[in-house]
Amino acid sequence: MLDQVCQLARNAGDAIMQVYDGAKPMDVVSKADNSPVTAADIAAHTVIMDGLRTLTPDIPVLSEEDPPGWEVRQHWQRYWLVDPLDGTKEFIKRNGEFTVNIALIDHGKPILGVVYAPVMNVMYSAAEGKAWKEECGVRKQIQVRDARPPLVVISRSHADAELKEYLQQLGEHQTTSIGSSLKFCLVAEGQAQLYPRFGPTNIWDTAAGHAVAAAAGAHVHDWQGKPLDYTPRESFLNPGFRVSIY
């Protein structure tokens, strides 16, 4: 099933690129929480929803662009968790650092994940405890890698005082910044060793990247040391967390 989901992410990426390249208007509007949404978000959402309903008609889907109410999903044990375009701010800035995120959740755990970066044409995927990166048609297994001093990857668009204080206390390290779920993927492929997050994220922002990072050997825990959990709950918000090889 992983190959079909990867192809679905690629198809969604193609729909996004039609807007990114100017073939279709971007049509940026603000949602109720003031976050931006574009025609590309909606186009990718439609591609993924149609594809997953065909691939697995019995598994419900939770997408950022059309999340079902709590009464609908409160008893879900297995479901798809989708962000059709993660990094909309990066998309609008046209820096290429946005992704398509698709994860399969089973009893609160992301057991399959796909993160596709359309501009870079790079696909990260994970299933059955293994993670891969596909680039230029070549797919290879990836895993975390230690480095001293560690490289800490941080958000391109979301900095905060807590993060600044944490980095000051961390000891010797280097930092790099990148948008979207690519932060998880940098840790997964051994380029970075730590991704700390204090600011707000939603479950669709993290599930696919979580699957990839965990399958590559990283720990994805909240600041109390518990793994991020995707068991249905009324709020879509995650607690703060860290993705770490340590």
Swiss-Prot record:
Keyword Lyase appears in the UniProt entry: no
Enzyme kind, highest EC tier: hydrolase
Disulfide bonds, paired cysteine numbers: none
Residues that coordinate or bind substrate: 64, 85-88, 205
GO terms, molecular function: 3'(2'),5'-bisphosphate nucleotidase activity; magnesium ion binding
GO biological process: 3'-phosphoadenosine 5'-phosphosulfate metabolic process; phosphatidylinositol phosphate biosynthetic process; sulfate assimilation
Superkingdom of the organism of origin: Bacteria
UniProt: Mg(2+) 1 binding residues: 64, 83, 85
GO cellular component, one term: plasma membrane
Keywords: Cell inner membrane, Cell membrane, Hydrolase, Magnesium, Membrane, Metal-binding
Binding annotation for Mg(2+) 2: 83, 86, 205
InterPro entries assigned: CysQ, CysQ/Inositol_MonoPase, Inositol_monoP_metal-BS, Inositol_monophosphatase-like, Inositol_monophosphatase_CS
The enzyme's E.C. designation: 3.1.3.7
Chief place where the protein resides: membrane
Subcellular location, record wording: Cell inner membrane
Pfam families attached to this UniProt entry: Inositol_P
Essential cofactor(s): Mg(2+)
Membrane topology field: Peripheral membrane protein
Swiss-Prot/TrEMBL catalytic activity: adenosine 3',5'-bisphosphate + H2O = AMP + phosphate
Family recorded in the similarity comment: Belongs to the inositol monophosphatase superfamily. CysQ family.
Matches recorded under HAMAP family: CysQ
PANTHER family: 3'(2'),5'-BISPHOSPHATE NUCLEOTIDASE 1
Function: Converts adenosine-3',5'-bisphosphate (PAP) to AMP.
Name of protein: 3'(2'),5'-bisphosphate nucleotidase CysQ
Species in which this protein is naturally found: Escherichia coli O157:H7
